[in-house]
């Protein structure tokens, strides 16, 4: 019976393993293979004078990244990976890999990002790359468990829609029989509708689509968003929920993914609560102290401004009290100063991670705000209808999973945090 490589210890007497040939070395009287599965790497040592001829013949024909089965005696060897090796009694090539390889899984020869993504299945065999996606999986599992523990219902909303969430042109049109349709930018409208349904607290982890022409290290055209909406809550309530989630996820990864963090050479620090709350006007002042292209009140924050503020704050933080005119139509204005709204962004020192707000729950005010944005309320009738039949006060946010993983692991490019990225220039594989 096959053992995962991690389960083979120096105390194991014999073992059968199956995995990929990571490296092949020939030192005259000895041949060495490094065999890899998703749990680790083990050395297979072939003393040429002590193994059957058929094993030697098979060993000579093995190419890197071929899949092999090895059964043999385990010996404790201090200098070998994991302090043990296998001397084979059986060696079988299950699947042969062509040579040369499109890229070097052992990473002795580096590869450009495009080369890596063109052969992502092979790139993902690298222990370092695999560690990123084990951690990403841990992030989403921890977030799901945390939100369920807070009473949130996991929902699934349409990704093919008839209207834009926020208007604008950042839409992917698709052929949908005789109708006009688009890929959804956000589950925003649907999660608000579930507040009218009485679900009270919901979340979704799913894809979002933005037809942005950005081609940067932090933008994707298809991304994964963690969205939350809570009834009978204001912006402060959901900011607290968001920072609790961030701290919980970091803590979970630090405790449960130590091996993968070590592979990435990361000493993960868990953020401290509460995160600072910085008013938008103050954030502009902080940024303008150091950036060359100064911002005026009412401007959105540039990447340079985000970095400048992040350098000053040095930790996760919220930007709050945004000008109403530059936030989505559904953001609730302050009653006593309607030029500002109850919106916020969660920031990492490197970039924005999340955006949220208390939402408008009054039908007439919402229609007024939609019109003020130059949009047609008639186009949003399906969304507005629930607001006529008892919509509770509510608030929520959306959090980018790729950006969360990217900043957590200090990755240089957001494409490192998604298996098969979709950007302006990449549609395959």
From Swiss-Prot:
Residues carrying the site annotation Important for tRNA non-discrimination: 81
Highest taxon above the source species: Archaea
Positions bound to Mg(2+) 2: 352, 355
Sorted UniProt keywords: Aminoacyl-tRNA synthetase, ATP-binding, Cytoplasm, Ligase, Magnesium, Metal-binding, Nucleotide-binding, Protein biosynthesis
Cellular component aspect of the GO annotation: aminoacyl-tRNA synthetase multienzyme complex; cytosol
Residues annotated to bind L-aspartate: 166, 210, 355, 359
Family designation: Belongs to the class-II aminoacyl-tRNA synthetase family. Type 2 subfamily.
Annotated binding of Mg(2+) 3, by residue: 352
Record field: catalytic activity: tRNA(Asx) + L-aspartate + ATP = L-aspartyl-tRNA(Asx) + AMP + diphosphate
GO BP, sorted A to Z: aspartyl-tRNA aminoacylation
Cofactor: Mg(2+)
UniProt-listed CDD domains: AsxRS_core
Function in brief: Aspartyl-tRNA synthetase with relaxed tRNA specificity since it is able to aspartylate not only its cognate tRNA(Asp) but also tRNA(Asn). Reaction proceeds in two steps: L-aspartate is first activated by ATP to form Asp-AMP and then transferred to the acceptor end of tRNA(Asp/Asn).
Region (Aspartate) location: 188-191
Keyword ATP-binding: yes
InterPro entries: Aa-tRNA-synt_II, aa-tRNA-synth_II, aa-tRNA-synth_II/BPL/LPL, Asp-tRNA_synthase_2, Asp/Asn-tRNA-synth_IIb, NA-bd_OB-fold, NA-bd_OB_tRNA
Compartment annotation: Cytoplasm
Main location: cytoplasm
Descriptive protein name: Aspartate--tRNA(Asp/Asn) ligase
Self-association state and partner proteins as the record states: Homodimer.
Entry's Gene Ontology molecular function annotations: aspartate-tRNA ligase activity; aspartate-tRNA(Asn) ligase activity; ATP binding; magnesium ion binding; RNA binding
Enzyme class: ligase
Entry EC number(s): 6.1.1.23
Source species taxonomy: Archaea, Methanobacteriati, Methanobacteriota, Stenosarchaea group, Methanomicrobia
Cofactor note: Binds 3 Mg(2+) cations per subunit. The strongest magnesium site (Mg1) is bound to the beta- and gamma-phosphates of ATP and four water molecules complete its coordination sphere.
NCBIfam families on file: aspS_nondisc (TIGR00458), PRK05159.1 (NF003483)
Binding site for ATP: 210-212, 218-220, 352, 400-403
């Amino acid at each position: 019976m096959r053992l995962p490589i991690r389960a083979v210890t120096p105390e194991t007497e014999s073992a059968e393993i199956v995995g990929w040939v990571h490296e092949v070395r020939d030192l005259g009287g000895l041949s060495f293979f490094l065999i890899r599965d998703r749990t680790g790497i083990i050395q297979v040592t072939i003393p040429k004078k002590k193994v059957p001829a058929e094993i030697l013949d098979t060993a000579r024909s093995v190419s890197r990244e071929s899949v092999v089965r090895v059964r043999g005696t385990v010996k404790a060897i201090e200098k070998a990976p994991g302090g043990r090796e296998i001397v084979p009694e059986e060696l079988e090539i299950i699947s042969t890999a062509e040579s040369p390889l499109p890229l070097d899984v052992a990473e002795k020869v580096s590869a450009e990002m495009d080369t890596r993504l063109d052969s992502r299945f092979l790139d993902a065999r690298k222990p370092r790359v695999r560690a990123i996606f084990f951690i990403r999986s841990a992030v989403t599992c921890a977030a799901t468990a945390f939100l369920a523990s807070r009473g949130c219902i996991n929902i699934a909303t349409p990704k093919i829609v008839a209207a834009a969430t926020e208007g604008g042109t950042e839409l992917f049109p698709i052929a949908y029989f005789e109708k006009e349709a688009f890929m959804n930018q956000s589950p925003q409208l649907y999660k608000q509708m579930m507040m009218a349904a009485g679900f009270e607290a919901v979340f979704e982890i799913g894809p979002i689509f933005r037809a942005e022409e950005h081609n940067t290290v932090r933008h994707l055209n298809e991304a994964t968003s963690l969205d939350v909406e809570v009834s009978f809550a204001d912006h402060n309530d959901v900011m607290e929920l968001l920072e609790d989630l961030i701290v919980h996820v970091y803590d979970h990864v630090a405790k449960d993914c130590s091996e993968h963090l070590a592979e990435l050479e990361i000493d993960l620090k868990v953020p401290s609560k509460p995160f600072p709350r910085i008013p938008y006007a103050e954030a502009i002042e902080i940024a303008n102290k150091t950036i060359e292209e100064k911002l005026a009140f009412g401007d959105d924050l540039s990447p340079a401004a985000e970095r400048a503020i992040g350098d000053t704050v040095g930790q996760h933080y919220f930007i709050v009290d945004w000008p109403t005119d530059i936030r989505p139509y559904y953001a609730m204005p302050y009653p006593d100063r309607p030029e500002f709204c109850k919106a916020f962004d969660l920031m990492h020192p490197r970039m924005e991670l999340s955006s949220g707000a208390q939402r408008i729950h009054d039908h007439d005010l919402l229609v007024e705000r939609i019109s003020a944005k130059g949009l047609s309320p008639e186009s949003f009738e399906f969304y507005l209808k629930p607001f006529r039949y008892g919509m509770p006060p509510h608030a929520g946010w959306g959090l980018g999973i790729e950006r969360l993983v990217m900043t957590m692991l200090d990755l240089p490019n957001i494409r490192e945090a998604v298996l098969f990225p979709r950007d302006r220039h990449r549609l395959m594989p």
